[in-house]
């Protein structure tokens, strides 16, 4: 096979496909049957933050990026100006 | 004992309808009494691949809704007297099917047929769910390509959790059928190999159907490939798969097209 590759000058792409699938499916299988993790995180973060500041539920964005070694969870909450003070004076 | 077999895949365009028609015809030729049921409501195609598109009067939805009786909707194949088709509706949407209604139709079909083969629509929505709901066995049609393998994995998960069998603690017997396989490209490392696909999906193999122009030729004329060109590579692959489905031990091989010497030397695919 390597001799063939010398002539064609191309690396075999099937092993890449295989490795990508194995990583992806291992992950997807582990999530199967569980409620949507991101939705759950979003709900709970929303509940905690709104206990202390007023916020618009539509302005809460929770995003997850999966890397090979680490994954990141990004939480983006937009607070209207003066929201905390409004909340403090109301409480 | 009647068997309900779903032909499914998740991904579209991998060969579910071709497989349903070819396996249905092969089983009927082997003496089994077979009905093929099109679950692709709104986008029916099994009638066309079977060459019965001008004979459709009533369909699955009509039977589910009690507009027609089952015998009125069943179309007998003109070539094989053991083979019948229950077409899908062309106009109604997928919500026209109810779980309970489909259950009734399947139960009635079980009484008069040896095999009830359900041709699933693509996707993982309601239509695909209903097609697999009452299955005893499943053929998961997979192309050696990343998106098809991923979708097959998803469908296997659904077969193990969303079917009546799964819910009652039994198992749906699952088989992988690899279609559109190109041995040359797999050998050159350009295509996932059979072993790769089987290892990833961890499900037994029913057969390997090579990529072939005979499949297109058969659908052009509205005849299952197993009838249209019985000696062709895909027809032989489907025939072997049918025998395995009936419990015979058939050695696994990849039927190939006859190649000319020049084609072999140049590494070209046979036309």
UniProtKB/Swiss-Prot annotation, chain A:
GO terms of biological process kind: cell division; regulation of division septum assembly
Entry's transmembrane regions: none
Pfam families according to UniProt: MinE
Keywords: Cell cycle, Cell division
Superkingdom of origin: Bacteria
InterPro entries the UniProt entry points to: MinE (IPR005527), MinE_sf (IPR036707)
Keyword Transcription regulation listed: no
Flavoprotein among keywords: no
Function per UniProt: Prevents the cell division inhibition by proteins MinC and MinD at internal division sites while permitting inhibition at polar sites. This ensures cell division at the proper site by restricting the formation of a division septum at the midpoint of the long axis of the cell.
Family: Belongs to the MinE family.
UniProt-recorded name of the protein: Cell division topological specificity factor
Organism the protein comes from: Bradyrhizobium sp. (strain ORS 278)
